[in-house]
Swiss-Prot record:
Stated role: Inactive metacaspase which plays a role in parasite bloodstream form growth and in parasite virulence within the mammalian host.
SUPFAM superfamilies, alphabetized: Caspase-like (SSF52129)
Protein name in UniProt: Inactive metacaspase-4
GO cellular component, one term: nucleus
Phenotype upon gene inactivation: Knockouts in the bloodstream form have an initial slower growth rate in vitro which reaches wild-type levels after several weeks of culture. Knockouts in the bloodstream form have a reduced growth rate and virulence in infected mice. RNAi-mediated knockdown at the bloodstream stage results in a more severe phenotype characterized by a growth arrest due to a failure to undergo cytokinesis.
Organism: Trypanosoma brucei brucei
Matching Pfam families: Peptidase_C14
Site (Cleavage): 64-65
């Protein structure tokens, strides 16, 4: 990407220098290891208390991340990443692969030579390399604000969440009956985080010239960022419907270039992979099916278009027996036939401008 090469050092028993992460081998080996397992549905949740935005922004200004690996060239702006994996260990909501998801995504980004200058990793498993803290509600809100704070043109942001997703009754939203929610590890005590608040903290104030890519591997995630454009297919009685980027909301326009890839539709559950032998010959690890397929596409050597990335991910899931359908939405009408990239501004479909 832009000629940059990462020179990360290894972690764990092979650590060469503290503070440097190498997850390329983890991500590659992970693909040797998936059969669908049933995700426990949390059920609709009560709306949480409203976020204290002033306190959240103040805490964000006191926060910082770390550089995960060395890069050979300096990007034009800051390149920040926030990775959240929640397994809910020893609870009724327990999942088994969400922390694997974020390690696999970080490894895929490293293999693509994505020049991260600062990252934060929130995980409820202590053995995740570079872990910043636990994915509590307060921490997630704090670092969502950290990711977006003081963003300037040419900055590149990346966000990944793997965990439970659920719904709460919508409030003051003419477009939806429900609000989608992500689920912190302490949701029983402190509640979920609704999509309106994620949009307000992470997206709404980003200036023109900033690029954000967000991945949500969770149930009910199709419109998690409430973005105005999405890839949709029109159905027709004769089966000749058309597919493309179309405006799905008349509000929530933002200046930044924001891309969201979500594991499934708002009314679907996101499945996990317990043992990836459905994808490859052997293995034992677990993780989110959408993350698994998406990172597999991202790590391919040949170039992909935006549409290729989405369609191939969908096809890979379907061919292995998964029923969920990943979604793509954006702040602007992306020209999906252009080459996929995590950096730079979107090539736009002029007919929708």
């Amino acid at each position: 990407m832009g000629g940059c090469v990462s020179t990360a050092l290894k972690v764990g028993a092979e650590t060469v220098a503290e503070g440097h992460i190498d997850l390329i081998s983890f991500a590659i080996n992970y693909f040797k290891n998936a059969v669908p397992y049933i995700v426990k549905y949390l059920g609709r949740q009560q709306r949480p208390k409203e976020v204290d935005m002033e306190a959240t922004l103040t805490e964000a200004k006191e926060s910082k991340g770390f550089q995960p690996w060395k890069i050979s060239c300096q990007p034009k702006g800051a390149v920040r990443g926030l990775f959240i994996g929640v397994n809910y260990g020893n609870t009724e909501a327990q999942l088994s692969g969400c922390c694997h998801d974020i390690m696999m995504m970080i490894g895929a980004l490293q293999k693509r030579n994505f020049p991260l200058t600062e990252v934060v990793i929130l995980a409820d498993e202590e053995d995740v390399p570079g872990r910043t803290g636990e994915p509590t509600r307060a921490n997630i809100l704090r670092y969502l604000a950290w990711l977006a704070q003081d963003a300037q043109p040419n900055d590149v942001l990346f966000f990944h969440y793997s965990g439970h997703g659920t719904r709460a009754n919508a409030r003051d939203d003419d477009c939806e009956e429900y609000d989608q929610c992500i689920v912190p590890m302490d949701y029983v005590e402190n509640g979920c985080i609704v999509d309106n608040e994620i949009h307000e903290i992470l997206v709404s104030q980003l200036p023109k010239g900033v690029r954000l890519t967000a991945v949500f591997d969770c149930s009910h995630s199709g419109s998690m960022l409430d973005l105005p454009y999405a890839y949709v297919c029109d159905s027709s009685k004769d089966g000749s419907g058309s597919c493309g980027m179309k405006r799905v909301r008349e509000d929530n326009d933002v200046q930044a270039d924001v891309l969201m890839i979500s594991a499934c539709a708002d009314d679907e559950a996101a499945l996990g992979v317990d043992n990836t032998q459905d994808f490859y010959e052997s293995g034992k690890d677990s993780g989110g099916a959408a993350t698994f397929c998406l990172t597999a596409m991202m790590m391919r050597e040949e170039p992909l278009t935006f549409l290729d990335l989405l369609v191939h991910t969908r096809e890979m899931l379907k061919s292995r027996g998964f029923t969920q359908v990943p979604h793509l939405s954006a702040s602007k009408p992306i020209n999906l036939m252009q080459r996929f990239s995590l950096e730079g501004l979107f090539p736009q479909e002029r007919t929708l401008l």
